Amino acid sequence: MAFDNFEILYKETRLNLEPASPSSVVQLRVAPTNAYGRSSLSSSSSSRPASATADDEKGYRTKNLATASSIYYRKHHSSPRGFLWRVLDNNTVLSIRVADVCRQEKVADAPLILNLRFASPLRPACVGFADHEDHDALFVYAIDQSNQLWSIILRPDHFRKRSATEGGLGDASRVYSPPGFGFKHPHRLAVVSPDQLIVTMHDGGILKFDRNKNHESHGSPWRESIYNVAGWGQSLRGLVPFQRNPTVRYEKINMELTAAASTAVTTMGHAETAFLFTICLDHRMRVWDVRTGQILYTGDILNNTKRDPQEVGKWTVDPSQNNLIRILDNGRGQCLVVTYSPVGAGEFKFWKVKANDQGSIHVTDCFPDARLMSPNPTSLDVWTLADFAIAQQPDGPELWALWKNNTSYRVNRLQIIPRNATAPFADGWKAVCVESPGPTPRASGSWNPTDSTEKWLDLIFSPGRFSKSTLETALAMYEKGLGTYKETVSRSGKGIAESICSVIGSTTTLDRSSQGGADYDQFRNTSETQWMRFWRLLLELDKQRGEALSLVFDQYDGMVWVTCADLLAAVRQCSDLERLYHNLQSPEKKNEDVAALISAGLTFVETFSDSMHQLCKAALRAELYENSALSDRERMQLFLDRAGFWVTDEDWAQVLDIVGQNYQMVTSRLYEDLFDLITATSEANSQELREPFTIFGKKVVVRAVQETVELHWQILFSQLILLVNMVDSESEEARPLHTRFDVGSVYRRLIDALRRLEHLRWMTKTELSVSPSKSRSGSSSPTLSKRGQDESYTRTALEELAGHLFGLPESNNMPLLSSITDLVLDLCAPTSTTVLNTWLIQCWLLKEGRPDLALELMPFAEQDPFSTYVQGRVFLALRDYDTAAQHFRKAAIGLSIPLKHVDRHSAGLLDDTEWNLLNSGLPNYYAHIVNLYDKQKAYSYVMEFSRLALQFAQTSNQDSASIKTEMLSRLFTASTATSHFEEAHSALLAMDDEALQKSYLRKLLERMCESGQSSELISLPFSGLQNKVDEILAEKCRATRDVLNGVPYHQILYAWRISHNDYRGAAAILLDRLEKLRRSGEGDKLGAEDGENGAGNDALDTQVTRQYLIVINALSCVAPQEAYILEDVPPPVPGKGTNDEEYSQTGSKRKLGKLNATSGEEDLDSRIEELARLLDSESAGDKKARPSSSSEEDQQLLERMQKFSTAVRQEQGQQTPRRLLRLEDLRKQYQQELDRIVAIQNNQFALTADGEDEDEDMMDIA
């Protein structure tokens, strides 16, 4: 029977072995031996391999493809239990990683990969592992080509923490040079226990190593024992020339026919000894007693007792065949041994072996009258057995076989029926569906919704499809073909995708067509051709990665693995739909109609052109992502119109041949059977997890989901196309489909199932780069050292966001290959128990700063209020504030209604304070939205939602009052920031907190003045705040030093007071500006100097004279009896007298006398200040011009007045002294200023400052 005719019950899932992060790879260099037998094993400073990218196929195989690989499972310890090991890089690197699918709940994951680099290449067939019962460690043994025996002990922490290997392994790594290898060549290594090893030699003998536990530090760690097939005599005669037995040449060594090609070790439950089974080159099986070194049994592996001794070559086994025997223990003292003979067509043989405590053994043929031959190949190519495994099932032994033809392989399973001795193999071989090379790329054209480059990038960079080394090597080889490759070219700073696009893009140019325009069709065709070349090169390289190396069966979990050169394939059981699909030509009797329906849909869609496929997918996207209010019939008609089907009679005839005329086979029951195939029958996924999946196990699930999604989508998509076309083409004369069953219901269920698959497809193809500290996976990678914590790892969205839901449930007693299928089927089912909350995924993406990915999930979002709110958060993060506001307004009612139980899950996007604002009324909800926009500084939307919050806020309770205060504050701030001063003014007047109101009033005035909105400021009423506005502006005026630059507060206050008819106040503030102008020396800048060109200006027109005119004009607007100003008297400047220079040295005594004669009704502080100014003025003059007695008298008077006023100042605030200036005084001062300017122009300068009578009419008041 050919492979293709086997019933397919299983499906393989290939895993890419490329690490998710470079930091998870630990490079350990094993140095040569030292004088004490210990190796120097140190950790590399870099977490990345030092080897460069291979630029040809040979270098690619050397650096990236393993020559030997398998999985070792420990017996005594389970955390971790399985280890995948690979021999790489010309046999110089032994790579080991944990390969457990599940882990104990409280045990940390082990994500690290240890690469042990040896100085001398290893012998791939001489690598072994052991597990000590008393020590939780992995014992690694290896023999290199320099005949050194390496012994390395790896603890679980070595696979969990980088820090465990930073200082090297120390005494955990040892090397030994056996003297027995001096004249014998090792061929196979068999590990009996951590303390006992066996090496088979080229001459048929064995070398046993027993650990010397009592040896000193300088002694030998192993005790050697040599045993031979025919004793020492025969062995020595073999060394004599011309007297040797027939040999086989292998790797430059002449192998004796008694040498072992394949070995297996078992104890059969005996603690005292072990038994070594060897399949030798002479086609015989020998059983050794490891304890004594005696051969207990010798026999042909096919139990052929009639072999011709002269036909030695016919029955010779190739020395490279190292997988010819497997042992299955069946209890104490007995086991089942399965051997395979590669001679001829190949044949399996089953042996029952019994052993007693005395060391004797009994071997019998289980089925002497039955033969199990190898299945026939699928073609003329030769298929050979690469490996096989035996497992115990309730119905009997189960045989798994791996067949190989170059880089292709097949896996088959055979259930043995021991009770049927005459026909134990009657159940027949069952096949495993091997993954196809990849989807066939469809042609690109104007009908494609995406660019051709984007299509190819999506295909090439599909998660888990190609490794980075494969892409880099293919690109280098492609460049070599173009003649543009340079070894020195550095791609630093460029990603591999960018490099590929750059190289392929350089081969295509946009030329002009014959009509003179751009020839886009030619450009597209040329680009497509180059991409197809690169794609084929990738497939050829990737095909080498799939070369099978070994087959492993996990007895504990019931899982089958195929290790390949650069891949690992997990064999899982097919779901019902997968089983039906892969056996479509020979379905089971109960599924014949469903198989016909599926076959009809697939056959119909296969006839579509590439453009028709794209149109159908575009119509489907609109149907999946749009919420339509149309009826089912209208929706199907709209789908037909959008797709624009063009079906020929021949294409439709194929469908009718399958489903019958008038679709008589199509019934509601048939569609129910179809939906049952994609519905999970187990509720195991909804139970509590007993053993969560590891990072490695999650990769298996994700890859299986990718395959299942594509298969389900292909079948359901074809069924949808078939359904709408059957409805469209049905005849009213016959009985139409819609009269037989509810076609609309089937249509909706197909759409819902496809929508679920599209959601999963997005999650399995979208990769996230996440730092270990932000992982949702809990213990996925908690043990990376500080050096690795800064490096991110790449995982799919499904693995990162839903990986914590993957695991084995409490009640699960099924094999792992079935449990994985059930989990995957439940994930893909429309009625899955695993709910993929789109809003929760979007919250996590927003928390991680990926709103672009969150936007892609919007078509899958639900329509509930919180989901709508999350969509608003997505657009808010993308700074699409208007769309975000629409979603926030839509969700307002639903998120403002109080609920008894609120599910507070947002992946950390919302804190407790924000949650408290939801479902607690519209004011709180809108206040929360205001906070969100405020963080984005979107002040126009802050204003909008602040108004909404204020609209619904009730002032009857304290909470609403606080919300009102906060919203008024936010409204004011936003309005001020956006220069909506009228809105800010309204918010300011509505504030109840006077302190807050005054603070914001100051901010508003400052903002309006700084932005030049003084006219709008004056137009605002400021009801009840006018005095405060005047006061704040007056403070700003007093604080202003430079009145010519900066904000013109004096002019603003002048205009404010003029608008409120306060002419005296307006004149007073300008008088202050006049004084500051005079102090700054503006009065000395004459008009001719102050002009732009220094000529053509009035010399009397200065800043000071103009200011005098404005003040005089302001006072002229009031009644004459009110035309005065109360001016603050500034403190004098020492040595310069008062502001108006009215106090001269010669008139000081008269002024002091006048001050002493002043009525006691005057303000005491004013008199003290006046006296102080007089004293300061006199101290600056000539001390000889005044009597000392008068000065002392004045000083004593000032001290008494200051002491007297101390008590008064404690009760009353100290006031600034002021004086009265009438309109006549200002005009007089203006005239004096003009005279002074004229005198300066005429070069007339006074030598003294007399003029003591010029201010006789001025009165100082308080």
From Swiss-Prot:
Q: What SUPFAM superfamilies would the database entry show? A: WD40 repeat-like
Which residue ranges does UniProt annotate as crossing the membrane?
none
Region spans: Disordered: 36-58, 770-791, 1128-1196
- Tell me which positions the record assigns to the signal sequence: none
Q: GO CC terms on record?
A: nuclear membrane; nuclear pore
Subcellular compartments: Nucleus, Nuclear pore complex; Nucleus membrane
**What name does this protein carry?**
Nucleoporin NUP120
Q: Which organism is it from?
A: Chaetomium thermophilum (strain DSM 1495 / CBS 144.50 / IMI 039719) (Thermochaetoides thermophila)
Encoding gene (name): NUP120
